[in-house]
Amino acid sequence: MQEKSIRLGIVVAEFNYDITQLMLQKALSHAKFLNAEVKVVIKVPGTFDMPLAIKKLLEKDFIDAVVTLGAVIKGETKHDEIVASQTARKIVDLSTEFNKPVTLGIIGHGATHEQAVERIEEYATRAVEAAIKLVQRTRKIDELKEVKETVIID
């Protein structure tokens, strides 16, 4: 049986564009390398603006998972903490609401610009890999009928 292809949506923040644009390039090339199809890329102003775009993608039957890409850079106030924590919370809520993976490829909070630059490839590729693995594994869960012994899904 041939495995169904994995269809991704990507939501990328424009804020800190020098970082997020490189993250998008890394994510697109890594998805291609892993034979996943990126169906839609949506650019939003900032990470705090991601949830609505994520929700719109999750509503589509042709999207199996959503990858988020962004960079929340530390400032002089606690704004970065609020943005990062609220966005992460909503991402989890949307994933469980729609029963589809939404992965967190958002650098920060607390990261300096230099630290964010160092983490571009790591965060982008890990978010893509996590989305693909979660789709594959949740498909295996969906195929389970009855379990008499311990099943390890990896």
Curated annotation (Swiss-Prot):
Catalytic residues as annotated in Swiss-Prot or TrEMBL: H79 (proton donor)
Substrates-to-products reaction catalysed: (2S)-2-hydroxy-3-oxobutyl phosphate + 5-amino-6-(D-ribitylamino)uracil = 6,7-dimethyl-8-(1-D-ribityl)lumazine + phosphate + 2 H2O + H(+)
Binding site for (2S)-2-hydroxy-3-oxobutyl phosphate: E76, T77, R119
Pathway: Cofactor biosynthesis; riboflavin biosynthesis; riboflavin from 2-hydroxy-3-oxobutyl phosphate and 5-amino-6-(D-ribitylamino)uracil: step 1/2
GO process terms (BP): riboflavin biosynthetic process
Keyword Transferase: yes
One annotated Gene Ontology cellular component of this protein: riboflavin synthase complex
Binding annotation for 5-amino-6-(D-ribitylamino)uracil: F15, T47, F48, D49, A71, V72, I73, L104
GO molecular function ontology, one term from the record: 6,7-dimethyl-8-ribityllumazine synthase activity
Record Pfam families: DMRL_synthase (PF00885)
Assigned keywords, A-Z: Riboflavin biosynthesis, Transferase
Assigned EC number: 2.5.1.78
HAMAP family, A to Z: Lumazine_synth
Function: Catalyzes the formation of 6,7-dimethyl-8-ribityllumazine by condensation of 5-amino-6-(D-ribitylamino)uracil with 3,4-dihydroxy-2-butanone 4-phosphate. This is the penultimate step in the biosynthesis of riboflavin.
Family: Belongs to the DMRL synthase family.
Record-given protein name: 6,7-dimethyl-8-ribityllumazine synthase
Species for this entry: Saccharolobus islandicus (strain L.S.2.15 / Lassen #1)
Gene: ribH
